[in-house]
Amino acid sequence: VLVDTRPDETAAILFTSGSTGIPKGVVYRHRHFAAQVDMLKNAFGIRPGEVDLATFPPFALFDPALGMTTVVPYMDPTRPATANPTYLVQAIEQFSVTNLFGSPALLKVLGKYCTEHARVLPTLKRVLSAGAAVPGDTIAMMQKAMPKDGLVHTPYGATECLPLACISSADMSPELLAATRSGKGTCVGQPVAPNRVAILRLTDEAVETFGPEDLLATGAIGEIIVSGPTTTDSYWQRTAQTRLAKTRDPDGQLWHRMGDAGYFDAQGRLWFCGRKSQRVQTALGDLFADQIEAVFNGIEGVERTALVGVGAPGQQEPVLCIELHNIKST
């Protein structure tokens, strides 16, 4: 027997990853989950009867509401980069999987395997990946392993509001990828309807309310904020963090501050530049990790990089940490 619930009743407390701070419990109400199901269906064309490979367990919780069958692969979901791709391919082929939600690390493993072994997964028509920027070469490898009408989607959002925006492999032109490599940031696509997304002036302080004068024009980098049906309103028993993460417009509408720096381009596409808290504040202005690191990550022999700031904010010196390919300990 289903319990009779009301839209504003608390349905769950979902914790943030804690990758950039202390994990916080996000209060989800029934209306948030209902809106997420509707937005996922409409944004990605998910239909009842599909089969999902659950490499990311939290997304699998949506499968019954979306009418999808769940296939659980043999892997450690907390360490997606260590997944055995042969097991993933076997599960996809055995159960005719149509949908896969995986981290960028898992897609890199699976895409590389399919490329090296010339494997095509004819039933896999949709791949979703979130949690971090997905490299262009990873998207290309996965696209090659899918049927011609298959698409790789990279939704952008957070536990507090998901999905916020999305871009698919069909829209990832060579020009966009080149822009990322040249330091423009990562294009995360158009806002997912009916979300409203804006760019707020950068500040580390609480913003109780904002007006038009606090919003930035096209091309200017600020903090990404969003208001929509999946925008949650509080953290569990964390009043101070809630105050920092939420704001209201002149009409009293609630908005969530993503804590991410970004901007809109002339085509209305949203670009991610990096975490606001990880920006390097120099005497000449701010530097954003995703923009800077992408330039150096494209250099042959470089595995990954990390931009950090040394010194007091406003006078920091930028330092780039570089990890090279195939470094072996001796």
Task: Identify what each model region corresponds to.
Residues 34-51, 56-98, 113:
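Conserved AMP-binding/adenylation subdomain of ANL enzymes
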Residues 16, 206, 211-283, 289, ...:
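Conserved ATP-binding/catalytic segment of the ANL
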Residues 68, 98-101, 111-183, 196, ...:
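Gly/Ser/Thr-rich phosphate-binding loop
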Residues 1-15, 22, 45-50:
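Conserved pre-ATP/AMP-binding loop-to-beta segment of ANL
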Residues 2-4, 182-191, 214-215, 245, ...:
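Short Gly/Pro-enriched turn/cap motifs at secondary-structure boundaries
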Residues 9, 123, 148, 301-304:
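Glycine-centered tight turns that cap/initiate beta-strands
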Residues 209-211, 259-261, 298-325:
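C-terminal boundary motif of the adenylate-forming
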Residues 327-330:
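Short, conserved charged micro-motifs
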